[in-house]
Swiss-Prot record:
Gene Ontology BP, a term: base-excision repair
Residues annotated for Zn(2+) 3 binding in this entry: 182, 229, 231
Native organism taxonomy: Bacteria, Pseudomonadati, Pseudomonadota, Gammaproteobacteria, Enterobacterales
Name this protein carries in UniProt: Probable endonuclease 4
Cofactor note: Binds 3 Zn(2+) ions.
Species per Swiss-Prot/TrEMBL record: Yersinia pseudotuberculosis serotype O:1b (strain IP 31758)
Family: Belongs to the AP endonuclease 2 family.
Keyword S-adenosyl-L-methionine attached: no
HAMAP family, A to Z: Nfo
Enzyme class: hydrolase
Keywords from the named record: DNA damage, DNA repair, Endonuclease, Hydrolase, Metal-binding, Nuclease, Zinc
Binding site for Zn(2+) 1: 69, 109, 145
Catalytic activity: Endonucleolytic cleavage to 5'-phosphooligonucleotide end-products
Cross-referenced CDD domains: AP2Ec
InterPro entries according to UniProt: AP_endonuc_2, AP_endonuc_F2_Zn_BS, Xyl_isomerase-like_sf, Xyl_isomerase-like_TIM-brl
Length: 285
């Protein structure tokens, strides 16, 4: 089964994200459990936690259909010890919040070396950060997102994701989320069925589909291999609609959140309906 939705606002309370997803007729959704541009947030109150869980139950969302995202401020590969510790503490707090809400996944960007340490050192720091955070929490899987490779961000190569996973001690609690815009901007072509076959074969070989825990379905304003992260609405960017139809028809992408982060939220309901319609098309041979 395909779980399709969008990254919805949690303004007014995390339970409001559930309602917004339901209004889109989404079968999945993403959210921030706190203000993503602040380091600290008040702990989740018991009534807030209970309201979120009851609203999920009311509208039929399980933890397998929900892909929360952590704060953009966190850098688990930070080259400066003090800043790294701050990021690690914040990441643990994000995992705890997910744990309290009954969520099983936490999506995050791996980290940046800021031109101060080399890639391998940064990847090792990211893995160490994940190990520390997983040791301090339970029940939530750390889901590493591929990046476009802007600036000094790592995670733009599938090999980066594989290198991090290799160093994570509890393999049962680590996974990946593949963003189509990021992949395209990082040099993984997705414009034709043949391109999709090639790119996802590489993902399977280098990372392994057993680690795929979610997808971000975004077209790209940015050019192929530009290392620039600019999302667009489905079919309106440089990738086109082929890959999104491909994903909806391929069972390797079943039972994970497939999340829109496209630029026009006014057409999310239409985009979700179109994605759902693609499951009825026979797969290409």
């Amino acid at each position: 089964m395909k779980f399709v939705g969008a990254h919805v606002s949690a303004a007014g309370g995390v339970d409001q994200a559930v309602i917004r997803a339901h209004e889109l007729e989404a079968t999945a959704f993403a959210l921030f459990t706190k203000n993503q541009r602040q380091w600290r947030a008040a702990p989740l109150a018991e009534d807030v936690i209970e309201k979120f869980k009851l609203t999920c139950e009311k509208y039929g969302y399980t933890s397998a259909q929900i892909l929360p995202h952590d704060s953009y401020l966190i850098n688990l590969g930070h080259p400066v010890t003090e800043a790294l510790e701050k990021s690690r503490e914040a990441f643990i707090d994000e995992l705890v919040r997910c744990q309290q809400l009954g969520l099983s996944l936490l999506n995050f960007h791996p980290g940046s070396h800021l031109l101060q340490i080399d890639e391998d050192q940064c990847l090792a720091r990211i893995a160490e950060s994940i190990n520390i955070a997983l040791d301090a929490t339970e029940g939530v899987t750390a889901v590493i997102e591929n990046t476009a490779g802007q600036g000094s961000n790592l995670g733009f190569k599938f090999e980066h994701l594989a290198a991090i996973i290799e160093k994570v001690e509890d393999k049962s609690r680590v996974g990946v989320c593949i963003d189509t815009c990021h992949a395209f901007a990082a040099g993984y072509d997705l414009r034709t069925e043949e391109d999709c076959e090639h790119t996802f074969a590489a993902l399977g070989k280098i990372v392994g589909f057993q680690y795929l825990r979610g997808m971000h379905l975004n077209d790209a304003k940015s050019e192929f291999n530009s290392r620039v992260d600019r999302h667009h609405s489905l079919g309106e960017g440089n990738i086109g609609k082929t890959v999104f139809s491909y994903i909806m028809r391929d069972s390797r992408f079943d039972n994970i959140p497939l999340i829109l982060e496209t630029v026009n939220m006014d057409i999310w309901a239409e985009e979700i309906a179109w994605l759902k319609s693609q499951t009825e098309i026979e797969p290409s041979l």
